[in-house]
Amino acid sequence: MVTKAPAKTEYEAVIGLETHCQLSTKTKIFCNCSTAFGADPNHQVCSICMGMPGVLPVLNETVLEYAVKAGRALNCEIAKYSKFDRKQYFYPDLPKNYQVSQFDLPIAEHGWLEVEIVDEQGEATRKKIGITRLHMEEDAGKLVHGGSDRLAGSTHSLVDFNRTGIPLIEIVSEPDMRTGLEAAEYAQEIRRIVRYLGVSDGNMQEGSLRCDVNISVRPRGQKEFGTKVEIKNMNSFSAIHRAIDYEIARQIEAIETGEPIIQETRLWEEGAQRTIGMRSKEGSSDYRYFPEPDLTPIEVAPSLLKQWQSELPELPAAKRHRYEEEIGLSPYDTRILTDDHAITQYFEATLKAGASAKQAANWLMGDITGYLNNESLSITDIALTPEALAELIELIEANTISGKIAKELLPELLTKGGSPKKLVKKKGLTQISDAATLESLIDEVLAAHPQELEQYRNGKTKLQGFFMGQVMKRTSGRADPKATNQMLAKKLKG
């Protein structure tokens, strides 16, 4: 079986994503139970989220606010009138035997999202992906299988209802994507947006963001869609990319060998790097939707819509564009700096403290990010403040210290914090830039190595690095590298 989609083919894939985002509310969508992650099983439930007789749900107003803000951030039209519906199906993790969702009148429709693909040369291409709808719904519980990570092969299954009733927004895209790379980037941009808005943490490992892929393959140029297959169980953006590439190759091979493609739901197996059949795919009629009688319809007042619109922050795409146009950063740099909202905030605070954009970007994307990755930390975990980073950059640009000395100071600043200026003074690391002092040092080094000096003047010019190293050794790295190198070159020529 081919496991990677061919780069060139007479077929094309048609891909759409359904993205579920858990909203970062303190309580569930229709009751006051906590939404905190990691509680003991079945300790965050009540008669409402468990669907006991005689209780009535009440919509959490923050859920509506977050849904509207997400809808506007995705350029959607906000419905003047929407409602909740019951989506009916039987599964052990659904205590009411129906899920409260939205069917024909969702809160937001007809939006779009622009994704940016940066190639290996750092060049960016942009593509607009349509958003069909965004709707609110409640999450189901979680099945825990004994003896296996899924139902097949398990010895028993347990149900944790803590997740039941946690508020979700489901974002349904148009089938505008054609590759696994585009789909993975679309999903990442959704996560960036909900994180910038503060409506979801977008944590895929904890299930706060989940993506289902709908994919079909057709001959290039054909307008009709092929048979649609849904893929589930992808817990990273790279898994989305790989699962789609695999499924494209599988469907192309099936078409070329005459094997029928059935409409079904398939699971991505991370270990085997393949999709496997799970069940036949249901249609909307199978769920027997009907209006939720226990919840009133939703009408968003124009004044409230205007207020929520005014509270939207600068979003990732706008920020990337500003960084490129106003600050002059490359598409690659802007992509890295805007991927994590916390790093974006740190970067902007560093600029506000007076640092140059390019230097701040280099430090953040280089040594600081390397440290964070090695230590599995977030930018919010370090002791180095944005103001201190700006101060460190100022010391380098003023030739008070060299970049090498700054890198040596960084580990202590990251773990203990404090003022770089005070640390440099305390350790006696101020850079030596005085011409007379440097000239004296160079003369001493040349006098101490007459043999190497003769070899240099006989054509072995690479020895300049040796002499430079000797000066740095005598000054413990404090000699101004640029000034030292220039003066050394003149002295060596005699």
From Swiss-Prot:
Region annotated Disordered, chain positions: 475-494
Q: Which reaction does it catalyse?
A: L-glutamyl-tRNA(Gln) + L-glutamine + ATP + H2O = L-glutaminyl-tRNA(Gln) + L-glutamate + ADP + phosphate + H(+); L-aspartyl-tRNA(Asn) + L-glutamine + ATP + H2O = L-asparaginyl-tRNA(Asn) + L-glutamate + ADP + phosphate + 2 H(+)
| InterPro entries recorded | Asn/Gln-tRNA_amidoTrfase_suB/E (IPR017959), Asn/Gln-tRNA_Trfase_suB/E_cat (IPR006075), Asn/Gln_amidotransferase (IPR018027), Asn/Gln_tRNA_amidoTrase-B-like (IPR003789), GatB (IPR004413), GatB_C_1 (IPR042114), GatB_Yqey_C_2 (IPR023168), Gln-tRNA_amidoTrfase_suB_CS (IPR017958)
Q: Coiled-coil stretches, from where to where? A: none
Alphabetically ordered keywords of this record = ATP-binding, Ligase, Nucleotide-binding, Protein biosynthesis
> Which terms under GO biological process does the entry name?
glutaminyl-tRNAGln biosynthesis via transamidation; translation
Which top EC class is named for this enzyme in its record? ligase
Protein origin, superkingdom:
Bacteria
Instruction: Give any GO molecular function from the UniProt entry.
Output: asparaginyl-tRNA synthase (glutamine-hydrolyzing) activity
EC number(s) recorded for this UniProt protein:
6.3.5.-
* Family annotation (SUPFAM superfamilies): GatB/YqeY motif, Glutamine synthetase/guanido kinase
Database matches in SMART domains: GatB_Yqey
NCBIfam families per UniProt: gatB, PRK05477.1-2, PRK05477.1-4
The record, for PANTHER family, names:
GLUTAMYL-TRNA GLN AMIDOTRANSFERASE SUBUNIT B MITOCHONDRIAL AND PROKARYOTIC PET112-RELATED, GLUTAMYL-TRNA(GLN) AMIDOTRANSFERASE SUBUNIT B, MITOCHONDRIAL
Function field: Allows the formation of correctly charged Asn-tRNA(Asn) or Gln-tRNA(Gln) through the transamidation of misacylated Asp-tRNA(Asn) or Glu-tRNA(Gln) in organisms which lack either or both of asparaginyl-tRNA or glutaminyl-tRNA synthetases. The reaction takes place in the presence of glutamine and ATP through an activated phospho-Asp-tRNA(Asn) or phospho-Glu-tRNA(Gln).
What is the protein's quaternary organization?
Heterotrimer of A, B and C subunits.
The record's family statement is: Belongs to the GatB/GatE family. GatB subfamily.
Q: What is this protein called?
A: Aspartyl/glutamyl-tRNA(Asn/Gln) amidotransferase subunit B
The gene it comes from is gatB
